[in-house]
Amino acid sequence: MRQGSHIIDLHMHSVHSDGTFTTQDLLNMLWDKDADIFSFTDHDSVGCYLDLEKGLAKLYQGVTLIPGVELTCSVDGNLRDMLGYGISIPVMAQYLDSRYSLENRVRKQQLILERFKEICRGKSLTFDEGITANEGRKAEGYTVMFMELNRHPENIEKYPFLNDATRLYWDHFTNKESEFYVDETFDLPSFEEAVEIIHRAGGMAFIAHPYVYGLSDEETEDLVRLAVRAGAEGMELKHQSNKKGHVEKLLQMARKYHLYTSGGTDFHGYNKPGIKLVTAFGNMQVEYEEISPWIGSVTHMEP
């Protein structure tokens, strides 16, 4: 790892989960931004690293790639995410292949889509009954229905929040109190299982974006405490969803629970328009000092 200043992004998604760019696309964009420390953290997938192993993508010189993953978890029936850094790709790939076969992923996404259709039918929303989810990608059932609902202006007139993918997902689709709630958690690991497999793969576990879930400060700290009890070593400090004061509050929690910190944009490409690699909405910067206590001790990949 080179000395001096660094340009860092430790959270991004590719076509191997719910992003829109390939591994090589991401590498090209990171090169253009002079990024030199980064991690591909697809949901429940290490496909980017397999692309590199197969020669389907190539690292450029002078960079440090931290092997990573974002594991989707269930906490009391709510979707929560755990990041793993410095993982063994073969160990994590074996776990993911056994837990999430393509057949199982397709079956789950189609079931989620059918449940979403049922809700929208009850709301007299307009959509094509023939749409399907047949690729097994993360959140595919949700995304297919979101795109279809937005093809019909009358749906947006009735429920304006339907045209905001992030708001619809977190405030309604995954919110048990919402009439648009669909349970996605029925086959997901707990925090404990996620941390255990990250550790088994030789990595370190970080609770992802603690403030993205719309919780109060007290509830957010409760969630962080659950992650700590499960064995997590760190938390994601910098993230595009943070509002004013969040970083300071997260820093206080990190000190209180003796947690390492990480940061990244959570870049998804066209699925989250406006969010750019490295800087998110243009004003985010992950400082090397925020990751230096741990980044040198985990497995990394270089050209």
Residue ranges of predicted features:
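Extended substrate/RNA-proximal surfaces in nucleic-acid metabolism proteins
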Residues: 58-221, 286-290
